Amino acid sequence: MSPDIGPWVARFERPGREIYDRRHEIVAATGVEAGMVVADIGAGTGLFTRLFAARVGASGTVYAVDISPAFVENIRRTSRAEGQHNVQGIVNSPSEVSLPPRSIDIAFVCDTYHHFEYPAAMMRSIRAALKPGASVVVVDFRKIPGFSTPWVMGHVRADESAVVREIEAVGFRLVEDRDFLRRNYFLRFVPVEDSNAH
């Protein structure tokens, strides 16, 4: 692990962070299966990349997509060290995920959507990368006055209903809203033409 990644691992992969504590339930809820192609968008330290890589197996692929070259290089290095040869790293731009067209079964966006500088462009880019019948899972912080922490209230740009409106405005439909997390929501979207597929 490169020295600049260590503090991020300590921050993101720690007991007490809901996403870390419930990571196995979150992965199960995505429906990722052996042989699938998954994009972990905003992959960060690779927590979910590693879990998806184990789940899709040798016949599947996980794209670890992040805007940070240091994060992507760390994921490449740690994946190789752990024998996960089904992981590919992609450094993306603020408005483009840089994935091959019609290549993925599930796009997973965890505690990352609120960082998108150009959410409409990013979601259109993700849509272009989806295979027919594919879906996008968005997990992000609940932003609720009186419930959410001051950090979330100040840091997270949009609440859940605004996120749903933004994503639906670029040609997606919400098809699943799972209520098993306390501090985060779990939403699944499909392109409008595929809205009856799930």
Annotate the PLM regions:
Residues D105-A120:
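A short SAM/SAH-binding and catalytic strip from SAM-dependent methyltransferases
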Residues E176-H198:
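Core SAM-dependent methyltransferase catalytic element
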Residues V97-I106:
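A short acidic, Gly/Pro-enriched loop at the edge of an enzyme's catalytic core
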Residues V37, T61, G133-S135:
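Short glycine-centered segments of the SAM/dcSAM-binding site in methyltransferase folds
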Residues M1-A39, R77:
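Class I SAM-dependent transferase core
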Residues A54, A120-S135:
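A short glycine-rich, Lys/Arg-flanked "PGG" loop and its adjoining helix->strand segment in the class I
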Residues S135-V164:
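Conserved class I S-adenosyl-L-methionine
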Residues A39-V97:
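Class I SAM-dependent methyltransferase SAM/SAH-binding core
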